[in-house]
């Protein structure tokens, strides 16, 4: 027998935490706006927004939020844009560790941190040509919460 589990996008009754970086705020505010609108469209009424200085600081906040057991999911939003130094690689690498926290705590942690080569690419992904990755991250969070409830 084959059983297929497929979650819907009904977020009614869910609690989400959005952790958003202040660094590159002109990008991250667009991501946050997209995420909050997406949550609203999917019936989510309970969202806590936590602002952190930058993407590098996210993992410890994600860990604390996950350990609190207050939220059904955690969505991370940020923008790391490549510069002329190795700083991009360091920050991108550290922020990528966020996913392991979700596995450790059995909570969906959605990675909505843009890692781009140029400012233009980041702008495109924050609500222009390439859609809004914040909105996509929020929809993914709703779906993952529902999927985990089916397991």
UniProtKB/Swiss-Prot annotation:
Keyword Transferase in annotation: yes
HAMAP family, sorted: Lumazine_synth
Pfam families documented for this protein: DMRL_synthase (PF00885)
NCBIfam families named among the record's database cross-references: lumazine-synth, PRK00061.1-4
Chain positions recorded as (2S)-2-hydroxy-3-oxobutyl phosphate binding sites: 84-85, 125
Family membership: Belongs to the DMRL synthase family.
PANTHER family membership: 6,7-DIMETHYL-8-RIBITYLLUMAZINE SYNTHASE (PTHR21058:SF0), 6,7-DIMETHYL-8-RIBITYLLUMAZINE SYNTHASE DMRL SYNTHASE LUMAZINE SYNTHASE (PTHR21058)
Reaction(s) catalysed (UniProt annotation): (2S)-2-hydroxy-3-oxobutyl phosphate + 5-amino-6-(D-ribitylamino)uracil = 6,7-dimethyl-8-(1-D-ribityl)lumazine + phosphate + 2 H2O + H(+)
GO molecular function: 6,7-dimethyl-8-ribityllumazine synthase activity
Pathway linked to the protein: Cofactor biosynthesis; riboflavin biosynthesis; riboflavin from 2-hydroxy-3-oxobutyl phosphate and 5-amino-6-(D-ribitylamino)uracil: step 1/2
Keyword match Cytoplasm: no
Organism for this UniProt entry: Leptospira interrogans serogroup Icterohaemorrhagiae serovar copenhageni (strain Fiocruz L1-130)
Protein's recorded name: 6,7-dimethyl-8-ribityllumazine synthase
Annotated EC: 2.5.1.78
Functional note: Catalyzes the formation of 6,7-dimethyl-8-ribityllumazine by condensation of 5-amino-6-(D-ribitylamino)uracil with 3,4-dihydroxy-2-butanone 4-phosphate. This is the penultimate step in the biosynthesis of riboflavin.
Active site per database record: 87
Gene (name only): ribH
Record InterPro entries: LS (IPR034964), LS/RS (IPR002180), LS/RS_sf (IPR036467)
EC class: transferase
Gene Ontology cellular component terms for the protein in this record: cytosol; riboflavin synthase complex
Binding site for 5-amino-6-(D-ribitylamino)uracil: 23, 55-57, 79-81, 111
Sorted UniProt keywords: Riboflavin biosynthesis, Transferase
GO biological process, one term: riboflavin biosynthetic process
């Amino acid at each position: 027998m084959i059983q297929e589990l497929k979650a819907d996008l009904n977020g009614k009754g869910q609690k989400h935490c959005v952790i958003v970086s202040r660094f590159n705020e002109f990008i991250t505010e667009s991501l946050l706006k997209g995420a909050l609108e997406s949550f609203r469209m999917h019936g989510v009424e309970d969202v806590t927004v936590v602002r952190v200085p930058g993407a590098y600081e996210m993992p410890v906040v994600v860990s604390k939020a996950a350990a609190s057991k207050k939220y059904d999911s955690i969505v991370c939003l940020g923008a790391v844009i490549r510069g002329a130094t190795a700083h991009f690689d360091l920050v991108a690498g550290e922020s990528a560790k966020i996913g392991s926290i979700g596995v450790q705590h059995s909570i969906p942690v959605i990675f909505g941190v843009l890692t781009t080569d140029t400012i233009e690419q980041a702008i495109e992904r924050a609500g222009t040509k390439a859609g809004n990755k914040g909105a996509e991250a929020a929809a993914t969070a709703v779906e993952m919460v529902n999927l985990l409830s089916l397991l």
